[in-house]
Amino acid sequence: MATQTLPAQMTALYYEKPRDFSIIKADVPLIDHDEVLLKVSMCGVCGTDQHIHEGEFIAKFPLIPGHEVIGTIVLAGNQVENVKVGDRVVCDVSETCHKCFFCQRGTPLFCESFEAHGVTLNGGFAEYAKFRAAKVFPIKNLTDEQATLVEPASCAVHGLDKIRPKPGSECLLIGAGPTGLMLAQLLKLNGAQRVVLAANKGMKMDIARKINAADEYIDLDRKDAANQWAQLKEDNPHGFDVVVEATGVESIVNDSINYVRRGGTLLVYGVYDNAARVTWSPTKIFQDEINIVGSFAQIHCFPRAVAYLESGKIRTDGMVTHVYKIEEYQEALDKMASRQCLKIAVKPN
């Protein structure tokens, strides 16, 4: 086992229970023969972390959160062959059992014992974090800030797999968060001849234009966008082949089906409050043969996400708008809640 001198303890963000977190000294994780220990350089913060803070999603407590982890390997088990000490890596945080009903049917995303570092297992809001070596991927050309976007990019790749857009598709993407902006770019790269991005006017849409995320942009009025939605329908009387709802807002997901073309697809892509409900007409779904598809997390999409970002085909310039120290995590949550940011990251030291 390759080694170097390591401290016995580390600084970590620790939740005892929902809404109850503190900065603590925790033991540096011990690794097994097939695992690596990372010195975390940065970890992204996303909407899922807000839901974890509230005790929603699939979170388990107590917990060290953080699921968009970048770091350098400082310790490797003696069975590790794919990476080595000194490699900068990003981490696929999903863990599956390989033996349940769904895993054996080749659909491990639905694993009955599904776990995720930073959600149900300890993650990257700490100075050190451990992962199975099979779940880490070296990066070369990405800054730490850019690398925080690999995990959400992998979710966008999975979303693309679920949509399977036909060449020449017309697509409407609602919401301009990080993973939505990357999915918009993936649609452009994979068959869509027209991508329309609709989101609230402000910083996110400004960045969307800078990275050329879409073909057309609709800057929605935050207070009253009713006329703009009506105009969108008038301008597109037959709707869109693909509609992606990426806001996580209950009222918008309810309305999004009204922009789907007959025979088209609605991708439910946002992270919603557990209490959110939809009231779609089954007759409309039946008569218009609308495909309603969910896209949750990802499995086996990291290599493609790394390749897209390393090549520059997916642009991420300026998407990380705020970086905080781990001790400033409450400020990070407050900034995210204010909607005055696009992507936030945390540095452990």
UniProtKB/Swiss-Prot annotation:
CDD domains: threonine_DH_like. InterPro entries: ADH-like_C (IPR013149), ADH-like_N (IPR013154), ADH_Zn_CS (IPR002328), GroES-like_sf (IPR011032), NAD(P)-bd_dom_sf (IPR036291), Zn_alcohol_dh (IPR050129). Optimum pH is 9 for the forward reaction, and 6 for the reverse reaction. It is an enzyme of class 1 (oxidoreductase). Pfam families: ADH_N (PF08240), ADH_zinc_N (PF00107). Its EC number is 1.1.1.287. Keywords: Carbohydrate metabolism, Cell projection, Metal-binding, NADP, Oxidoreductase, Virulence, Zinc. Zn(2+) 1 binds at C46, H67, E151. Binds 2 Zn(2+) ions per subunit. Zn(2+) 2 binds at C97, C100, C103, C111. PROSITE patterns: ADH_ZINC (PS00059). One of its GO terms (molecular function) is D-arabinitol dehydrogenase (NADP+) activity. It is found in: Cell projection. GO terms for cellular component: cell projection. Belongs to the zinc-containing alcohol dehydrogenase family. This is D-arabinitol dehydrogenase 1. It comes from Uromyces fabae (Rust fungus). The lineage of its organism: Eukaryota, Fungi, Dikarya, Basidiomycota, Pucciniomycotina. The gene is ARD1.
